[in-house]
């Protein structure tokens, strides 16, 4: 069974999700409606495993590069930049990634898939944005403003130096396979944002520089 992990990098404010599969688990067949598309993605999976070695057990999930860039490493492969446009609005720029060398049949398939799945007219994007809009509106209400929100889900279960069958995963890891959910990555985002708001200089924010200098001095 695959393990579902959240991975945070405290010093930078970045975070992501990954699925950790057993070493001997085969990849499920995909895109079977078209032989050309199916063969292409089967080839891509073979190449991924060959190039990644032991890390091929890791399958990427949505993640964030602090402060406002989001990525989706699997399908649909996208990069998004979130731009605040005032207190109550955010503008999103999203890029969709297609392999330049992919056959025309694959490019046509991905174009249709991306439009149906993601983007302003996509099935999941509309659903996600509806949730965010309602959550934002509710947060402006009287009761919501009266009480502080709790972001404690999963606290105390973080793991440093996570290892599985010899594969070490950097960062601070939260295993949510059984729990299904955690606010571990969100806390990391807000933690880093707070540091930016309170820091007196860029040097105070670049903690990795101080660590590197300390190691060099030793």
Listing of model-derived features with the role each one plays in the protein:
Residues 1-218:
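C-terminal catalytic domain of Rieske-type non-heme iron oxygenases
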């Amino acid at each position: 069974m695959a393990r579902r992990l959240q991975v945070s990098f405290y010093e930078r404010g970045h975070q992501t999700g990954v699925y950790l599969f057993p070493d001997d688990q085969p990849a499920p067949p995909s895109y079977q409606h078209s032989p050309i598309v199916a063969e292409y993605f089967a080839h891509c999976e073979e190449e991924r495993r060959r190039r990644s070695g032991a890390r091929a057990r890791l399958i990427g999930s949505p993640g964030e590069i602090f402060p406002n860039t989001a990525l989706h490493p699997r399908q649909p492969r996208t990069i998004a930049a979130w731009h605040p446009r005032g207190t109550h609005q955010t503008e999103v720029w999203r890029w969709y990634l297609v392999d330049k060398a992919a056959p025309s049949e694959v490019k046509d398939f991905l174009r249709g898939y991306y439009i149906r799945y993601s983007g302003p007219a996509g099935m999941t994007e509309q659903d996600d944005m509806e949730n965010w809009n309602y959550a934002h509106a509710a947060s402006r209400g009287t009761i919501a403003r009266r009480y502080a929100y709790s972001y404690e889900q999963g606290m105390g279960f973080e793991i440093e130096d996570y290892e599985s069958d010899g594969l070490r995963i950097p960062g601070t890891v939260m295993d949510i396979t059984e729990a299904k959910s955690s606010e571990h990555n969100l806390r990391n985002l807000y933690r880093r944002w707070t540091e930016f708001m309170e820091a007196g200089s860029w040097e105070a924010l670049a903690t990795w520089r101080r660590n590197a200098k300390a190691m060099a001095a030793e």
